Amino acid sequence: MKIGYARVSTGLQNLNLQEDRLNAYGSEKIFSDHISGSKSKRPGLDKAIEFARSGDTIVVWRLDRLGRNMEDLITLVNELNERGVSFHSLEENITMDKSTSTGQLLFHLFAAFAEFERNLILERSSAGRIAARARGRYGGRPEKLNQKDLNLLKTLYDNGTPIKTIAEQWQVSRTTIYRYLNKLEEKEDEKQGEVSN
């Protein structure tokens, strides 16, 4: 059985073109989603997969209707294969049926591209972090308290002000105050170590 799946990203788009192509190809049942491909929950696709039985084929108008990226597509094709379901894209004229040697070749090519895409993303992310560090930027949230606040915090603490009161003054948790105090203590230890050398 051929099971169609159609997806549009916005409410401004409609499914008519995709559904017409899926019907012309002989899809007996069509499931659809009006949702961005970047969303992980696609109820129409989930229903299509659940409906499909071994020997069925899920048909899409274009590959990008099925997966957000190559990795998602590979994961989905694997899931379909485990169920004995093949996959066909009309626009690209690609059939992925891992029971055939051509289907296996295509699957491995797609898997290689998915890994390549993952590695490119990792390389770009790493290069971005290195470039940011070179400009003096580091990841994570900015510190809540500046050096002036830290000096006042230390003075209040040294004068016996309760941690709870200090935390309320800066609207942070007591754990955060303890963390700042530990950092200040470490800095003082480092300075004393430098002086004694």
From Swiss-Prot:
Active-site positions on this chain: 9
Domain Resolvase/invertase-type recombinase catalytic positions: 1-136
Keywords linked to the UniProt accession: DNA integration, DNA recombination, DNA-binding, Plasmid, Transposable element
GO molecular function, one term: DNA strand exchange activity
Gene Ontology biological process terms, A to Z: DNA integration
Naturally occurring in which organism (per UniProt): Staphylococcus aureus
Protein name as it appears in the record: Transposon Tn552 resolvase
Family note: Belongs to the site-specific recombinase resolvase family.
Gene of this entry: tnpR
PANTHER family assigned: DNA-INVERTASE FROM LAMBDOID PROPHAGE, SERINE RECOMBINASE PINE-RELATED
Top-level lineage group: Bacteria
Pfam families: HTH_7 (PF02796), Resolvase (PF00239)
Function: Resolvase catalyzes the resolution (a site-specific recombination) of the cointegrated replicon to yield the final transposition products.
Gene3D superfamilies to which the protein is assigned, alphabetical: Homeodomain-like, Resolvase, N-terminal catalytic domain
Binding region for DNA: 163-182
